[in-house]
Amino acid sequence: MNLSNYYWYFKSALRPKFCDEVIKYALSKREKFALTGGVGRQRDLNNKPLSRKEEEGVKQKRNSSIVWLDEGWIYKEIQPYVHEANERAGWNFNWERTENVQFTKYKLNQYYDWHCDSCDNPYKNGMIRKLSMTCQLTDGSEYEGGELEFDFRNYDPHMRDESQHLNKAKEILPKGSIIVFPSHVWHRVKPVRKGVRYSLVAWHNGYPFK
């Protein structure tokens, strides 16, 4: 699917106080080792811990800590921006619900390699991920590395080089910035070289495209 806009952003959209409150609240919770879909994102590691091979497999793709949040005051802040981006970017995807929000902590050398958030196999409720959102909780001056990068992949590989289809989302470095994008768009978080990067991620689900 070729798109006119592969993401839509809102610079410094959320108040710094809100960002600080989310960080404080999330850090008061017990964080978890971030998983990938291959081993089950909702897997209970207390009852079914990863084998050494599984852990190594996850870390080839992803290395970070997360906290799941299901708080109305957070949804109230972020959802209007998702609706606005969906309309202004021209996607006009029909979506019904937001999954639990993921607070993510990237420390030194932590990352999330290339992936997309959606697949054609619906959840049990019959829905798929349609729109993804990331909120920058820490200012870009507070850490180094950790760039959110997109691969639009709308190119003929024999005609174009990598520099023409990779895009670093520098627009969202200021604290409180929000970026929304279709969940099938490939993206990654590059390794953090200094400091800690905190972000808030949410997925907005709807019934499969027809």
What are these regions (language model features)?
Residues 1-180, 184-210:
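Fe(II)/2-oxoglutarate oxygenase catalytic core
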